[in-house]
A protein has these predicted regions:
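Alpha-helical transmembrane segments in inner-membrane proteins
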Residues: 2-361
Length: 361
């Protein structure tokens, strides 16, 4: 008996040390990804030029004052670095929201857009592009209506799911499907009656996702929102673990998941709303990344959330780099590339017989 206990303790220590090692490794890889990604782009810049701009802006080294302005400064500081940091924030947001949504609806196939957020955002963007709604917002004329559409859709789904009793996982999924269908129908109707091919092309490009509109102002909004929401969810890992067991079990343990579920949905919707505002709709990140981490480290959200955040951030950074360099003098929509990578990975996850969700095999 004592030998079994000692072996169990030894195994848990090994798993904990492995988790810490992987956490540190992913954090180091994320830092490396940021530093490496800013060296890629259509402009042919040397490593010295790139890092000299960063060093001057961060530490104000007088010997590098030549990089305080000019074309090299603008490319590195105003275009590349904000884009990399925005990819970090959006990738982190999508991955963490994927983890949370899968726990909330108790469905391993759920993604951040399960509540119809993508359809609501697309409707907002369609109205902005096709009808000129939000034209007074200037550079945010598409992003702000898309954000509003995403948030309105989320709250509508939550309200519908709470009609006739408390919201359950099944009611949330069904309400999301219904609202998503309505938003898609209205989007198609607006495109049909407007009959503007150029505007329709713009809607299609927006729906594919892009980080080309990155700026320091967007990073200044997206990054703090993401970090705050991630911290909120990480402090709630015990309740997220309970959600995988179901409402009946949680009630017997003295926890009412109904209010928590609504709160988590609102926080996740805010985070996804800002992600849509900054980058459009990018799929599969919030679906595949949580599964990869869950396969390696199980379903404990104390580990699942930070690891998913780090891996998702690095993944989207490198996807964006690929989008910039694959096509010469052009840029591939990041949503297309992520889907090309994510779909085969997701199919592989589906056929794995040894993989379970929430403790079920």
């Amino acid at each position: 008996m004592k030998e079994q206990v000692s072996q169990t303790k030894k195994g848990s220590v090994l798993r904990a040390s492995m988790y810490v090692a992987v956490l540190i490794g992913l954090a180091a890889f994320l830092i490396f990804s940021i530093l490496a990604a800013i060296t890629f782009g259509n402009a042919d810049l040397s490593l010295k030029d790139v890092y000299s701009v960063i060093a001057y802006k961060l530490f104000h080294i007088k010997s590098l004052s030549a990089y305080a302005e000019g074309a090299v400064h603008d490319v590195v500081w105003l275009i590349r670095l904000p884009r990399v940091l925005l990819a970090l924030a959006v990738g982190m947001a999508l991955s963490v929201c994927g983890v949370v949504m899968q726990a909330i609806v108790q469905n391993p196939l759920a993604d951040p857009y399960v509540l119809g957020i993508s359809s609501g955002a697309s409707l907002g963007a369609t109205l902005a592009i096709m009808l000129g709604v939000g034209g007074f917002l200037g550079g945010n004329s598409v992003g702000v209506p898309a954000f509003i559409g995403a948030m309105v859709t989320s709250f509508a789904v939550i309200a519908i799911a709470n009609m006739g009793g408390k919201a359950t996982s099944a009611k949330l999924i069904l309400a999301g499907m219904a609202v998503s269908a309505v938003c898609s129908a209205f989007s198609n109707f607006v495109i049909y009656i407007t009959n503007d091919k150029n505007a329709a092309t713009e809607v299609m490009k927006w729906s594919m996702g892009s980080l080309a509109g990155a700026s320091w102002s967007r990073v200044g909004v997206m990054l703090p929102v993401t970090l705050i929401c991630v911290i909120i969810f990480w402090t709630q890992y015990r309740n997220l673990n309970l959600m995988l067991l179901g409402d009946d079990v949680s009630i017997t343990l003295g926890t009412d998941l109904h209010r928590l579920r609504t709160f988590y949905l609102i926080v996740a919707s805010v985070m996804i709303g800002f992600a849509v505002y900054c980058a459009g709709v990018i799929g599969f990140v919030g679906l595949v990344i949580p599964h990869v981490i869950r396969i390696l480290f199980g379903t404990d959200h104390r580990r699942l959330l930070p690891l998913s955040a780090l891996l998702g951030a690095s993944f989207l950074i490198w996807c964006d780099v690929a989008c910039r360099v694959i096509l010469k003098n052009s840029e591939m929509p990041i949503g297309v590339l992520v889907s090309i990578i994510g779909a085969p990975c997701f199919i592989y996850l589906l056929v794995r017989k040894s993989y379970g969700f929430g403790g079920s095999k």
